[in-house]
Amino acid sequence: RYIPYDQEDVKRQMVAAIGIEDKNTVTRANYYTLDLXIDTVTPDVNRNELKEK
């Protein structure tokens, strides 16, 4: 099912939750993981790339 999230608000919450400063790394796919209640919203590859910056 589709839930019309307030995308900017969702981005802010996810950025705070997973400690990513660049909100642009939050993708549409991540919105669906929120609805599924999955805590891990960022693939390990992206997480490693962010650590290197």
UniProtKB/Swiss-Prot annotation:
Compartments annotated for it: namely: Secreted
The record's EC number reads 3.4.24.-
Q: Which GO terms describe its cellular component?
A: extracellular region
**Free-text tissue specificity from the UniProt record:** Expressed by the venom gland.
Where does it mainly reside?
A: secreted
Q: Report the cofactors.
A: Zn(2+)
Look at the named UniProt entry and state the broad enzyme category this protein falls under: hydrolase
Q: Does the keyword Transport apply?
A: no
User: Which molecular function GO terms apply here?
Assistant: metal ion binding; metallopeptidase activity; toxin activity
Keyword Zinc among record annotations:
yes
- Post-translation: what modifications? Contains numerous disulfide bonds.
Per the entry, what modulates this protein's activity? Alborhagin-induced platelet aggregation, but not shape change, is inhibited by EDTA, suggesting that the platelet activation (shape change) is independent of divalent cation or metalloproteinase activity.
Q: Which UniProt keywords apply?
A: Calcium, Cell adhesion impairing toxin, Disulfide bond, Fibrinogenolytic toxin, Glycoprotein, Hemostasis impairing toxin, Hydrolase, Metal-binding, Metalloprotease, Platelet aggregation activating toxin, Protease, Secreted, Toxin, Zinc
GO terms (BP aspect): proteolysis
Q: What does the cofactor section's free text say about binding?
A: Binds 1 zinc ion per subunit.
Q: How does it assemble?
A: Monomer.
Protein family per UniProt:
Belongs to the venom metalloproteinase (M12B) family. P-III subfamily. P-IIIb sub-subfamily.
Give the protein's biological function.
Answer: Disintegrin alborhagin-C: 42 kDa fragment of alborhagin autoproteolysed that does not show platelet activation.
**Protein name from the UniProt record:** Zinc metalloproteinase-disintegrin-like alborhagin
Organism annotation: Trimeresurus albolabris (White-lipped pit viper)
- Source organism lineage? Eukaryota, Metazoa, Chordata, Craniata, Vertebrata
